[in-house]
């Protein structure tokens, strides 16, 4: 217990009791001030009630003085205790007085009929002060009335009457039995700590967070996909990734750029009977063959080979120059030809049909590679391979050099043994993900994602296609929980999963830092409309961008408020004043109010429902989650 909290717990009650004691006996002094019998009697009665009224007033003043404090609940308890002490003293004094006159009460009358009205008034004042203290002790700062314009509903709401979703409706829409954690079922802006900022290391700032039921999504409506926008340091991992990884009960793929989720969650998932795989470049011996799914479950090998080539070659949703577009398209065709040669020509053993072998073939000296392409064209058993190689056989050396340089650049990451091992290994198969009991954590840090996005694109694309190609023949749904997804760049398979993934057992939860990241990765402002149209829920929190705040304000809608207006006019004959009430339009939440939201508060949008303003499920505030989470490598000394 801090010193401030201890002082607030003791001082108000002590001052209330002291004031009551010090003002006792004032009835004689006040009565002496009267000049008539009636005045002396009235002042004497007031003096009897004065000690208790003064104590009650001090309690109320103390509560208003501590309004906005993090320890206001302690002050409320103190005022409650002080009010109770004052009432007990008043009752005790009155009992003693009545006991003294009980022998003189006429027969047939109750001694209670002689209770002093002044003392009763004073005790009532102390009672109401104690009730107010109890309210503050329970609700904190939320016990005080909040100022704001009066909202109008019904026929008079000419400018709109949008409102926040009620928590009862939110509980029906997002029951706590779901697997994807959305947030917590309470209004942060109405909590006792709403006036102070959220601090992870100050439990006093948490308020009701961590003690209320969860809001979870069970995929019952919409596409089942979700999008999260939260700024840097906005508790994305602690409020979305970790809680969802704890609750999700089916197949799970997590892109973990911080490499902290897997160590904290793996043991919990294993205890639930799940197979946990961590794809970490620093750990040798763990990897899968990114080409093992090609041609399975009814799809043609040629289509799948082209898909792999598009993942390696970073797609660009924006129009590039004709020259750049030619070399990139030709480089992708060269990669397609080399992958097809490894998989279809028939001269490569099954265990060697990997991307590592493709890179080995590509990294030969340019003249030797041209000779290999000629040999492939002449001896391949696949017409598809021949058709893709044919264009390079008689290509001019200068043009081929440009194509070769592009292909080598895009596959450069396959030269690193640890990166190549992740997509050319045999410790597990992509088919393992379809059984619904396999979890894969992709522990690629931001440096790797920035320098070699093709690595993560190949991993995620292979796992997505391994599920997609099964045409829904999977156990349960597989959740792809992708943090820092903008680092992957434009990935067409994600758009395919977005539009048709629900039917094939794929659920996406994608985490961005801002709208700008999404627009940069997926092609300007049109990207937001495409993704928002296909998302079941969209969450915004920890917003620092004014453009994003303006978008949220507009999407929340408008309300009609009643505004008091006063007009003053001054003339030669005097002045006049008139008052009127007007109906005006006001956004449900203004952009600057969005920017001022606490870090543990979010706004969630769903189709066909009012906007939801609720808390965030930060794992270290919840005892049920803290007990299941392992040590955080960034905070080894403290779990929280």
From Swiss-Prot:
Ranges of compositional bias, category Polar residues: 562-573
Listed A to Z, the keywords are:
Cell membrane, Conjugation, Membrane, Plasmid, Transmembrane, Transmembrane helix
Q: Where is this region: Disordered?
A: 562-583
UniProt keyword Cell wall biogenesis/degradation, yes or no: no
Protein's cellular compartments: Cell membrane
The UniProt record lists the keyword Membrane: yes
Q: Which stretches are transmembrane?
A: 6-26, 46-66, 72-92, 118-138, 212-232, 440-460
Q: Which InterPro entries match?
A: P-loop_NTPase, T4SS-coupling_protein, Ti-typ_conjug_TS_TraG-like, TraG/VirD4
> How would you describe this protein's topology in the membrane?
Multi-pass membrane protein
Q: Where is the signal peptide?
A: none
Q: Name one GO cellular component term.
A: plasma membrane
Xref: CDD domains: TrwB_TraG_TraD_VirD4
The record's section on Pfam families has: T4SS-DNA_transf
Domain of life from the UniProt record:
Bacteria
Q: Which family does it belong to?
A: Belongs to the VirD4/TraG family.
Any idea what this protein is called? Conjugal transfer protein TraG
Species: Rhizobium radiobacter
Q: What is the lineage of its organism?
A: Bacteria, Pseudomonadati, Pseudomonadota, Alphaproteobacteria, Hyphomicrobiales
Gene of this entry: traG
């Amino acid at each position: 217990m801090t010193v401030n909290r201890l002082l607030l717990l003791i001082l108000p009650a002590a001052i209330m009791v002291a004031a009551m004691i010090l003002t006792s006996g004032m009835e004689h002094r006040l009565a002496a001030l009267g000049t008539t019998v009636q005045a002396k009697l009235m002042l004497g009665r007031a003096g009897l009630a004065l000690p208790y009224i003064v104590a009650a007033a001090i309690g109320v003043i103390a509560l208003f003085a501590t309004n906005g404090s993090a320890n206001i609940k302690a002050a409320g308890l103190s005022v409650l205790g002080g009010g109770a002490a004052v009432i007990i003293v008043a009752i005790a004094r009155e009992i003693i007085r009545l006991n003294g006159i009980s022998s003189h009460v006429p027969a047939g009358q109750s001694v209670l009929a002689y209770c002093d009205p002044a003392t009763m008034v004073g005790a009532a004042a102390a009672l109401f002060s104690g009730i107010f203290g109890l309210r503050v002790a329970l609700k904190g700062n939320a016990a005080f009335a909040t100022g704001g314009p009066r909202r109008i509903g019904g026929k008079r709401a000419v400018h709109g009457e949008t409102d926040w979703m009620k928590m009862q409706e939110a509980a029906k829409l997002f029951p706590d039995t779901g697997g994807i954690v959305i947030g917590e079922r309470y209004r942060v802006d109405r909590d006792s700590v709403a006036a102070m900022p959220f601090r992870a290391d100050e439990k006093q700032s948490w308020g009701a967070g961590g003690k209320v039921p969860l809001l979870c999504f069970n995929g019952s409506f919409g596409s089942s996909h979700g999008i999260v926008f939260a700024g840097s340091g906005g508790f994305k991992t602690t409020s979305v990734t970790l809680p969802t990884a704890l609750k999700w009960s089916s197949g799970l793929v997590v892109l973990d750029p911080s490499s902290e989720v897997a160590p904290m969650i793996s043991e919990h998932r294993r205890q639930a009977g799940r197979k946990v795989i961590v794809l970490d470049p620093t750990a040798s011996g763990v990897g899968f063959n990114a080409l093992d799914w090609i041609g399975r479950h009814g799809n043609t090998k040629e289509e799948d080979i082209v898909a792999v080539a598009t993942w390696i070659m970073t797609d660009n949703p924006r129009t590039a120059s004709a020259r750049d577009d030619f070399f990139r398209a030709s480089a992708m065709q060269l990669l397609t030809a080399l992958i097809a040669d490894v998989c279809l020509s028939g001269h490569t053993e099954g265990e060697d049909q990997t991307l590592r072998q493709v890179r080995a073939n590509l990294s030969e000296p340019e003249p030797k590679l041209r000779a290999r392409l000629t040999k492939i064209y002449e001896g391949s058993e696949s017409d598809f391979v021949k058709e893709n190689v044919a264009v390079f056989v008689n290509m001019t050396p200068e043009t081929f050099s440009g194509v070769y340089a592009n292909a080598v650049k895009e596959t450069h990451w396959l030269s690193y043994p640890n990166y190549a091992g992740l997509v050319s290994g045999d410790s597990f198969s992509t088919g393992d993900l379809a059984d619904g009991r396999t979890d894969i954590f992709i522990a690629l840090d931001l440096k790797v994602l920035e320098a070699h996005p093709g690595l993560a694109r190949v991993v995620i694309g292979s796992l997505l296609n391994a599920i997609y190609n099964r045409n829904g023949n999977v156990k349960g749904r597989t959740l792809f929980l992708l943090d820092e997804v903008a680092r992957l760049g434009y990935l067409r398979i994600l758009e395919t999963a977005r539009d048709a993934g629900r039917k094939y057992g794929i659920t996406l939860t994608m985490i961005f830092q801002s709208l700008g990241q999404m627009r940069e990765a997926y092609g300007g402002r049109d990207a937001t409309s495409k993704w928002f149209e296909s998302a079941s829920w969209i969450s915004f929190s920890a917003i620092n961008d004014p453009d994003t705040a303006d978008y949220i304000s507009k999407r929340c809608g408008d309300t009609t408020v009643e505004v008091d207006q006063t007009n003053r006019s001054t003339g030669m004959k005097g002045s006049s004043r008139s008052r009127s009430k007007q109906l005006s339009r006001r956004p449900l939440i203004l952009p600057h109010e969005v920017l001022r939201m606490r870090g543990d508060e979010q706004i969630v949008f769903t189709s066909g429902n009012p906007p939801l303003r609720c808390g965030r499920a930060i794992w270290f505030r919840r005892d049920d989650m803290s007990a299941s989470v392992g040590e955080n490598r960034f905070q080894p000394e403290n779990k929280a």
